[in-house]
Amino acid sequence: MDPTKFLDQFLGGDSKAKLQQAGGAAKQQFDRMGGMGGFAGGAAAGGLAGLLLGNKKVRKMAGGVVGYGGAAALGALAFKAYQNWQEGKQAASAPAATEADMPRTEARFLPDAAPAATGEPFQLSLIRAMIGAAKADGHVDAAEQKLLFEQVERMGLDAEAKGFVFDTLAKPTDLSEIAGAARTQEQAAELYLVSRLAIDPDHPAEKAYLEALAHRLSLPAELVAHLDRQAETGLSA
């Protein structure tokens, strides 16, 4: 299993670029599907994340992390948040990451920079974190899990990758396991960020989940605010 390829497949890869290359008809179809709720809207953006998160969250990701290359985009957002925080900028007015920032991302912020504290590829830790966050509101019911399993079968993943997704979906979310994957503050920031991308902060259960995760990751409140800012505004062009 190639962990970076798996993470990109999970996020939907460069679906935005593919839609632009396909022309107006494909984009119109995407827009129509995006107007539908739940899994239908999520499927329009491609990737398991699209199905898992549903329409309310995936539309943002389709223009950002999904649209600009998945794993590399996560690193760019985390690095921009970290950079703004270190420079003492106010989170509310801090500049958002753009496509031009991606080549300037420091290597330590890329998901493949180092293994997780547990020894597993850190890309798998990020996928586990996103699945856990998406389940925080309890919306992944048995019928939706069945659709996810069917989508996994269609994606051409190898047996190891399939098993990872199936096991993570089936078992209860363990915040200690998710937070325990962080070897460095950079990894902690990425685990929080990928979870924040899957969270609706207006939903009480999801907000509580995110606050608990930030606490477990020992992230400074100011850095958390910058990560929230990038999750909302980064790579949104």
Predicted regions span which residues?
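Primarily EF-hand calcium-binding motifs
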Residues: I131-A133
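Small-residue-enriched hydrophobic alpha-helices in membranes
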Residues: D2-R128, E144-A237
